[in-house]
C-alpha cells in the first residue's frame, strides 16, 4: 500500500526527474507559418470532451480564461505520436467562463475541447480522457508560480501593460514562460522583428500569448531561475523597444500601476486561499504612472 502511494505521488509530482531529451525540432513564434503540430483554435467546430479542476497556483491563467499549451514542448515522442494519429487538438485546448461566478477561488474547472470530425465516438472520448491526464500534469506544473513568487516580480517590474509576464509551467525539466501582448497591432510589430527562441504564438480569442520554453533552469536551482528571469525580462524590454519604435501612439508607454496589486491578490490566493473578485482584478486596465 505504501509503495502504491509513493508511486502515485511520484507520478503526479511536477518536479520529478523524468527529463525529456533535447528536442531537434524547435519551433519559433510566427505570424505567417502555422504550428507544425498544433493549429490555431477554430471556435466554429470544437466540442467539449472533458474537464480538469484547477489549483490556486494556476490562478494567473484562470483570470485569463484561456490556457494555451504547446504540447510538442512537454510531451514524450511516444505521446506526440498518439497526439498526431489519434487526436485533433489545437494550441489552446482549455477555456473557462468567469462571467457567471465573478470570483476566483483557484479551483475552477477547465473545459477541454477537441476538433475531431466524430464527436462522441469512442476514439474522441478516449482522446478526451488522455487529454485530461496531460492537462492535469500541466496544472501541477503551475506549482512553479507558488514556489517562485518572486519570478513575476522580477520580470514585470515597471513593465507596461502592453506586454506582461503572466505565469509559468514547469514540467519534465521544461520551463514554459507565458507572456501576453495586449494589442493585436503590437503582435504584428513584435513577432516579425525579434526572436523569442524556442517559442509558440497563440493568437487567441481573448489573449495574444507568446509561450517560450527554457531548458537552462531544468534543475530548478535558484541562481539559474534568477538568470532565466533576467533573460525573460531582457526579451520583453526588447519587445517594448520595438513597440515604441514602430507604433505612432500619442500616449506614452508607462509602467502598469495595476501589476503590483495583482501580484498581491495572486499571492494572497496561493498562500492564504483568499478568493479574488474578477471585477477587482480587472478594475483598472490603464497603465499610467511611471514613464519607461
Swiss-Prot record:
Disulfide bridge positions per record: none
Q: Which UniProt keywords apply?
A: Early protein, Host cytoplasm, Host nucleus
Q: Which branch of life, at top level?
A: Viruses
* Compartments, as annotated in UniProt: Host nucleus; Host cytoplasm
What cellular component GO annotations does this protein have?
host cell cytoplasm; host cell nucleus
**Which residue ranges does UniProt annotate as crossing the membrane?**
none
Q: Does the keyword 4Fe-4S apply?
A: no
- Entry's family note: Belongs to the adenoviridae E4 30 to 34 kDa protein family.
As for what it does, the entry says: Plays a major role to prevent cellular inhibition of viral genome replication by nuclear bodies. Assembles an SCF-like E3 ubiquitin ligase complex based on the cellular proteins ELOB, ELOC, CUL5 and RBX1, in cooperation with viral E1B-55K. This viral RING-type ligase ubiquitinates cellular substrates prior to proteasomal degradation: p53/TP53, LIG4, MRE11-RAD50-NBS1 (MRN) complex, ITGA3, DAXX and BLM.
Relate the assembly described in the record. Interacts with E1B-55k.
Q: What is this protein called?
A: Early E4 34 kDa protein
Amino acid at each position: 500500500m505504501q509503495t502504491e502511494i509513493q508511486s502515485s505521488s511520484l507520478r503526479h509530482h511536477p518536479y520529478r526527474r523524468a527529463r525529456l531529451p533535447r528536442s531537434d525540432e524547435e519551433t519559433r513564434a510566427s505570424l505567417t507559418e502555422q504550428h507544425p503540430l498544433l493549429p490555431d483554435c477554430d471556435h466554429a467546430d470544437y466540442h467539449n470532451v472533458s474537464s480538469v479542476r484547477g489549483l490556486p497556483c494556476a490562478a494567473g491563467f484562470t483570470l485569463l480564461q484561456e490556457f494555451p499549451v504547446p504540447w510538442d514542448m512537454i510531451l514524450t515522442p511516444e505521446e506526440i505520436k498518439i497526439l498526431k494519429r489519434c487526436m485533433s487538438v489545437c494550441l489552446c485546448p482549455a477555456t473557462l467562463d468567469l462571467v457567471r461566478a465573478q470570483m476566483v477561488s483557484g479551483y475552477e474547472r477547465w473545459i477541454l475541447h477537441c476538433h475531431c470530425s466524430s464527436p462522441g465516438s469512442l476514439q474522441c472520448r478516449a482522446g478526451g480522457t488522455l487529454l485530461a491526464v496531460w492537462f492535469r500534469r500541466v496544472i501541477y506544473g503551475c506549482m512553479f508560480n507558488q514556489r517562485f513568487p518572486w519570478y513575476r516580480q522580477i520580470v514585470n517590474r515597471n513593465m507596461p501593460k502592453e506586454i506582461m509576464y503572466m505565469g509559468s509551467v514547469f514540467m519534465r525539466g521544461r520551463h514554459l514562460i507565458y507572456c501576453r501582448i495586449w494589442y493585436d497591432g503590437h503582435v504584428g510589430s513584435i513577432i516579425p522583428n525579434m526572436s523569442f527562441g524556442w517559442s509558440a504564438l497563440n493568437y487567441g480569442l481573448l489573449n495574444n500569448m507568446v509561450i517560450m520554453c527554457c531548458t537552462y533552469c531544468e534543475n530548478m536551482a535558484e541562481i539559474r531561475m534568477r538568470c532565466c528571469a533576467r533573460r525573460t525580462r531582457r526579451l520583453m524590454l526588447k519587445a517594448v523597444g520595438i513597440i515604441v519604435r514602430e507604433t505612432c501612439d500619442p500616449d506614452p508607454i508607462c509602467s502598469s500601476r495595476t501589476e503590483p496589486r495583482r501580484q498581491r491578490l495572486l499571492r494572497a490566493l496561493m498562500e492564504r486561499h483568499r478568493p479574488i473578485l474578477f471585477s477587482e482584478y480587472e478594475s483598472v486596465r490603464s497603465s499610467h504612472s511611471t514613464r519607461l
